[in-house]
């Protein structure tokens, strides 16, 4: 019997506790506020001696918060529905400038009795740039906003809005009220006059009503703002109620004169006659401002206008471009210098990607499109006739191949050209090969790059409508995209020729170690000279060493091609491979690439394969001929390593190669033309 009575007692006790969560609750502040007993304040919020809740003072860019100290149970269970609630408060906003203020007041229902993440200015102390709009905020608010913020789609600079987890109001309206005749009357939030606000939420219909009226007037029957939103998914079981406010650049004071709140019942009506009085806002300060401040502002505006004119003139000179009549046909390929300047953030050293003999390259992001680009600044002295050169640039820009760095266009100004390329995020190949790189490429990645560069060079030589001689094929001119595909870049040295024409040049351009002997002798750049450079590139990638290295310890010059040939002559050509590649590589493929590099480095241009043949060898469509220096000694054709790299005889069934008769080394061949 006793056990049964005890069970009934505990059941009744816990049922009583459970039911208590659904009971009504109300409070009212009619005679001023009394922190910290029943009110928690943060930021610049204070309570004046006569009991006014002063959310902000005349400090700029600050926030202020005030919350009822005890949590309120809005739901019977975490997954339950929100109970009905209502609130009423009287507020006033006083700004140092009669026509400007910042930034308003918000009634808030929040999960904590503070909003430490709230920013000042347009965020009214509620949210910040990062969390504005997050569902995890669990914040319901009614804002009295005095600043127009286009980012939040504000109605105007004098509006009331219903906010749920975001400052983009679900519903808003210009501040005002509907009188008994059904006419809308405007109210000015920053009028310095007290006004009353009512907020009502019906838990059954999910209807939210916000109503306003001037001080000492009854609550209008028609609400100012209405929205239907179920707050059950927004509010947690226990929440805090209070106010948030913030200042911007204008000195403003935000006051709460009285406040009442009710849960599961109407908020108690405020005893307006008992509310603390607002301080006297002396008009002297306003007149003083106009008397002293306005002349100062006028002077400031005059000087600002002069500064603005000077700035515009200087800006126009700064962004001045050269544009001639003949360039109009290339308009779509021309970039504005102003856009390139802002894209590269003023061509600052921080964005410098690299510097070469023909100019510096900067990274940039085009404004608006957010396209990542690389901008190369080239002096006018590095071109032919300007019209001819620009025509070539535009023509190159029409190329489309996955292994070429896209040339997007150009800009011309003040004795320099700016060439705009697509940006390659992984930079140039050379940084993965030399000087103990932090990140190295394995053989699969290297052969992928080699195939890509070969494909791009073949496109330039044979697949496009005009022959393009690149002139500077080397690892530093091979760029890697996001997937480590090799893309041939730097067409600043390229010349275009019609198919079948005889390419001529007046001076030698290129890089020592990649220049073919006949190129240094005659100054003529051909497809064969590009193949020679590609041969040096093959050895460079496979060995991880530069074609020519000056060794300070021995005061000697290291020649990569001589070194590789010497190892081949000893029957140990694989000893030339880059040790950084590791052991997991196709040795037959590495050997083929090394021998192909030697073949392409032949001092006789007629003995070098075309890029079409090179691609066949690399793809395995054709087998590289057996290249054995021992087999060549009987025919009087052999590689000279120490005494010279004079002759390279190749045993082709087609007998396409001819040897040299001299005894010069590769270095001598490159400098003297192979004679």
Swiss-Prot record:
Taxonomic lineage from the root: Eukaryota, Viridiplantae, Streptophyta, Embryophyta, Tracheophyta
E.C. code: 2.7.11.1
Disulfide-linked positions: none
Signal peptide location: 1-22
Protein name per its UniProtKB record: L-type lectin-domain containing receptor kinase IV.1
UniProt-recorded Gene Ontology molecular function terms: ATP binding; carbohydrate binding; protein serine kinase activity; protein serine/threonine kinase activity
Any one cellular-component term (Gene Ontology): endoplasmic reticulum
Subcellular location: Membrane
Stretches of the chain found on the membrane's Extracellular side: 23-291
Encoding gene, per UniProt annotation: LECRK41
Enzymatic reactions: L-seryl-[protein] + ATP = O-phospho-L-seryl-[protein] + ADP + H(+); L-threonyl-[protein] + ATP = O-phospho-L-threonyl-[protein] + ADP + H(+)
Family annotation (SMART domains): S_TKc
Positions of transmembrane segments: 292-312
Species of origin: Arabidopsis thaliana
């Amino acid at each position: 019997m006793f056990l049964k009575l005890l069970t009934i007692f505990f059941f009744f006790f816990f049922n009583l506790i459970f039911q208590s969560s659904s009971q009504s609750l109300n409070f009212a502040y009619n005679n001023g506020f009394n922190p910290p007993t029943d009110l928690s304040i943060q930021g610049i919020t204070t309570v004046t001696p006569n009991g006014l809740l002063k959310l902000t003072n005349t400090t700029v860019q600050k926030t202020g918060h005030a919350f009822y100290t005890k949590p309120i149970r809005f739901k019977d269970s975490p997954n339950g529905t929100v109970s009905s609630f209502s609130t009423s408060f009287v507020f006033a906003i006083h700004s140092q400038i009669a026509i400007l203020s910042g930034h308003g007041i918000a009634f808030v229902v929040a999960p904590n009795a503070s909003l430490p993440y709230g920013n000042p200015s347009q965020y009214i102390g509620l949210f910040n740039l990062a969390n504005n709009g997050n569902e995890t905020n669990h914040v319901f608010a009614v804002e009295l906003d005095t600043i127009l913020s286009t980012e939040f789609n504000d109605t105007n600079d004098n509006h009331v809005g219903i906010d749920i987890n975001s400052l983009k109001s679900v519903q808003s309206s210009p501040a005002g009220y509907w009188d008994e005749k059904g006419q809308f009357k405007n109210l000015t939030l920053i009028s310095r006059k007290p006004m009353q606000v009512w907020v009502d939420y019906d838990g059954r219909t999910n209807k939210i009503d916000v109503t306003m009226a001037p001080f000492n007037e009854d609550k209008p029957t028609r609400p100012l703002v209405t929205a239907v939103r179920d707050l059950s998914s927004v509010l947690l079981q226990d929440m805090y109620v209070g106010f948030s406010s913030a200042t911007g650049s204008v000195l403003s004071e935000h006051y709460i004169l009285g406040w009442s709140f009710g849960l599961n019942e109407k908020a108690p009506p405020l005893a307006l006659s008992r509310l603390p009085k607002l301080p006297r806002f002396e008009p002297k300060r306003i007149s003083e401002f106009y008397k002293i401040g306005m002349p100062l502002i006028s002077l400031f505006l005059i000087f600002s206008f002069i500064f603005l004119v000077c700035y515009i003139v200087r800006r126009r000179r700064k962004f001045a471009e050269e544009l001639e009549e003949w360039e109009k046909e290339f308009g779509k390929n021309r970039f504005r210098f102003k856009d390139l300047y802002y894209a590269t953030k003023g061509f600052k050293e921080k964005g410098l990607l690299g510097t070469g003999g023909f100019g510096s390259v900067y990274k940039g992001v085009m404004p608006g499109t957010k396209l990542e680009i690389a901008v190369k600044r080239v002096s006018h002295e590095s071109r032919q006739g300007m019209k001819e050169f620009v025509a070539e640039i535009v023509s190159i820009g029409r190329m489309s191949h996955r292994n070429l760095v896209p040339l997007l266009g150009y800009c011309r100004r003040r004795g320099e050209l700016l060439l705009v390329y697509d940006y390659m995020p992984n930079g140039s190949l050379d940084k993965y090969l030399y000087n103990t790189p932090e990140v190295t490429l394995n053989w699969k990645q290297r052969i992928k790059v080699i195939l890509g560069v070969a494909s791009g060079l073949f496109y330039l030589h044979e697949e496009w409508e005009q022959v393009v001689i690149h002139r500077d094929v080397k690892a530093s001119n091979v760029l890697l995209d996001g997937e480590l595909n090799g893309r041939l870049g730097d067409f600043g040295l390229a010349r275009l020729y019609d198919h079948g024409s005889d390419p001529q040049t007046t001076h030698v351009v290129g890089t020592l170690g990649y220049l073919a002997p006949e190129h240094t002798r005659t100054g003529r750049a051909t497809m064969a000279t590009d193949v020679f450079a590609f041969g040096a590139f093959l050895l460079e990638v496979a060995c991880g060493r530069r074609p020519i290295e000056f060794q300070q310890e021995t005061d000697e010059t290291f020649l990569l091609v001589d070194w590789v040939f010497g190892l081949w002559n000893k029957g140990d050509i694989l000893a030339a491979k880059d040790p950084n590649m590791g052991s997991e590589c196709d040795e037959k493929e590495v050997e083929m690439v090394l021998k192909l590099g030697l073949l392409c480095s032949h001092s006789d241009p007629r003995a070098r394969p075309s890029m079409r043949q090179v691609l066949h060898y690399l793809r395995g469509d054709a087998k590289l001929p057996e290249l054995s220096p021992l087999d060549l000694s009987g025919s009087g054709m052999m590689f000279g390593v120490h005494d010279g790299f004079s002759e390279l005889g190749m045993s082709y069934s087609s007998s396409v190669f001819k040897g040299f008769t001299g005894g010069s080394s590769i270095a001598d061949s490159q400098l003297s033309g192979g004679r």
